[in-house]
Design a protein with these regions (language model features):
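Conserved C-terminal helix/tail region of periplasmic/extracytoplasmic solute-binding proteins
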Residues: 310-337
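Pocket-lining segment of extracytoplasmic ligand-binding domains
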Residues: 166, 171, 178, 183-274
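Short, glycine-/small- and polar/acidic-enriched structural segments
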Residues: 26-170, 175-179, 193, 197-203, ...
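Hydrophobic helical h-region of N-terminal Sec-dependent signal peptides
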Residues: 10-18
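Secondary-structure end/capping motifs
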Residues: 241-317
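Bacterial N-terminal signal peptides that target proteins for export
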Residues: 1-11
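Soluble non-cytosolic domains of exported or imported proteins
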Residues: 71-75, 90, 147, 151-155, ...
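Sec/Tat signal peptide C-region and signal peptidase I cleavage site
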Residues: 19-25
Length: 337
């Protein structure tokens, strides 16, 4: 290769890198992660009905490939995102905020929220008959949740503990927490053969646990924190900037999934039953979806509460000024909080 050709190729490469995102080809494969449970129902609907593929094709992106890896726990999801194994992720709001604060200011790693995903009530269930309130948990109790310290369940527990014992003791029950995916926590709690005797979880697991006469509910997150958004979807700033049409297609697919759930609760229940890793009946899922605390919306509602709490106890070093600082401009027209 002569010097002139090398110079020409170098110039072309530099020009390609300098092109705005809209001028580059967008990805032809997107990896979207989801976890277990009702909170991920919109993503489950999107997967079964191939909504991302349809909206991407309508946007002129052709036939894209969509894969749906399963992850549970904020730390695991964030590690996968940072390693380049994911493009878009459904995650508990605190896990997203943790990575947002950690990566802010680093152009290669910065992340932002694409949309809110879901809200429901997390129930703290226990098999210890002596445990009636948070104050009754002792050193021999073990509380299962998908991830310790920064997962949705972990931070919600800390927020509830701070309300009960004072902000200075927000992590008082952290030594009792054990990292277990929700399906495993359900099995452990009902079997009674494991060290785990409590679980802070979401539907369907929280409902199914109460079918056992050994299990009782200690507390509901809604009673303490209100009915705020629990899960969101996010991606890296780089992915969003380089794939604007795909991001818009994803959001359109998410809104269509939300509309389907609202319009056809029975059909949505069938979708969930087919996808569930635990045995649950259609009627049971219908009951969960009928709960007024269970909502699916792209509007983030109360997400800033997590950030304010996490900043106050110094688990994040950067505090967002508003919810719009956490989320990309595509949803700034919404009445979020």
């Amino acid at each position: 290769m002569n010097r002139r050709m090398r110079s020409t190729l170098a110039a072309l490469a530099a020009a390609a890198l300098a092109l705005p995102a809209a001028g580059r080809a967008e990805v032809q494969e997107v990896r979207i992660s989801r976890g277990h449970g009702i909170l991920y129902l919109p993503l489950i609907v999107m997967q079964e009905q191939r909504l991302v593929e349809r909206h991407a094709k309508a946007a002129g992106l052709g036939d894209i490939k969509v894969s749906w890896p399963m992850f549970d726990g904020g730390n695991i999801i964030n590690d996968a995102m940072l390693s380049g194994a994911l493009d878009i992720a459904g995650i508990g709001a605190p896990g997203f905020i943790t990575l947002w604060a950690k990566a802010k200011g680093n152009p290669k790693l910065e992340v932002g929220g694409l949309a809110g995903l879901s809200a429901t009530s997390l129930w703290l269930n226990s098999t210890n008959p002596a445990v009636k309130t948070l104050r009754d948990f002792g050193p021999r109790d073990r509380i299962a949740m998908p991830g310790i310290k920064t997962s949705l369940s972990a931070v919600v527990l800390q927020m509830m503990v701070a309300r009960e014992f004072g902000a200075a003791q927000y992590d008082k029950l952290d030594p009792l927490t054990v990292g277990l995916p929700h399906p495993d926590a359900l099995t452990a709690l009902i079997s009674g053969n494991a060290e785990v005797n409590a679980h802070l979880g979401s539907p369907p697991f929280s409902y199914l646990e109460l079918d056992s006469p050994r299990v009782h509910r200690v507390l509901s997150s809604v009673d303490v924190l209100g009915n705020i958004t629990l899960d969101v979807v996010y991606c890296t700033r780089r992915f969003r900037d380089e794939n604007p049409r795909l991001v818009r297609a994803f959001l359109a697919a998410l809104e269509e999934a939300d509309a389907f759930i609202a319009r056809d609760r029975s059909g949505a229940a069938d979708v969930f039953v087919r996808s569930s890793k635990v045995k649950v009946s259609r009627d049971e899922v219908m009951k969960m979806l009928a709960d007024p605390d269970t909502r699916f919306s792209i509007t983030p509602d109360g997400v800033l509460k997590y950030a304010e709490f996490m900043s106050s106890v110094k688990t994040i070093k950067v505090k967002p000024a508003s919810w719009k600082e956490l989320f990309f401009p595509e949803i700034h027209h919404l009445s979020g909080s």
